[in-house]
A protein has these predicted regions:
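Multi-pass alpha-helical transporter architecture, strongest
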Residues: 1, 188-204
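Intracellular helix-loop hinge segments at the cytoplasmic ends of transmembrane helices
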Residues: 53, 135-144
Length: 204
């Protein structure tokens, strides 16, 4: 069954109450979406900026091979973002957000413990899966605040780049202190925040 944009009447019922005494506050929904976006972007940023250095340091590969690994990671992310829309239409936003972020956690947690080719396979899988959540998160935010689509789009696209830049600076500072391998280990826990997607209303 095709999954269409939530009609305004349904959105109103989601944010004001579903008739059973459960009220979903707009600020609460946005807070959950921000947490999900934060965890997603921080993890992606950590891999984007440090994957090449990680595989060079841990597996002693040459820079060209390390760049191929980064290319594969970014390519999988682009594919995930592109296909995230149709996947969301098919399965629904809440399921896709939860499955994309929290579902990527087991693979992300394995990355620091496998060999070179295992790392490549896992980061490709994680990149594709976690990137597919972006369109679902954005559409959820737009439906919650249908009269402020421009502002919401700007905020979430701004978060995409802003959080990525801030995370890159933070992880760079942290890598100088504890090392790149430990940074990867710390970042691998970020997708666990996808569990917060279960707090989103089922009607959204």
């Amino acid at each position: 069954k095709p999954y269409h944009r939530t009609p305004p009447e349904a959105v109103k019922s989601v944010v004001s109450g579903d008739g059973s005494g459960t009220a979903w506050n707009v600020k609460f929904i946005f807070a959950i979406l921000f947490i999900l976006m934060f965890s997603k972007q921080v993890y992606i940023s950590s891999l984007t900026n440090f994957l090449t250095f990680y595989v060079m340091e841990k597996f002693h590969v040459d820079p060209v091979t390390a760049q191929y690994a980064l290319f594969a990671f970014l390519g999988a992310g682009a594919a995930g973002t592109l296909l995230g829309g149709p996947i969301t239409d098919r399965f629904g936003r809440r399921k896709v957000i939860f499955g994309s972020i929290f579902g990527a956690a087991p693979f992300a947690l394995l990355v620091p413990y496998v060999g070179f080719w295992g790392v490549i396979a896992l980061v490709i899988l994680v990149s594709f899966v976690i990137s597919s959540a972006f369109s679902a998160i954005l559409v959820c935010a737009l439906d919650v605040a249908p009269r402020h689509t421009g502002m919401v789009s700007g905020v979430f696209f701004g978060l995409t780049f802003g959080l990525g830049g801030a995370a890159a600076a933070f992880f760079g500072w942290l890598a100088d202190i504890i090392g790149i391998e430990n940074v990867f280990l710390a970042a691998s826990f970020m997708p666990l925040a996808g569990i917060f997607a279960l707090a989103l209303p089922k009607k959204l």
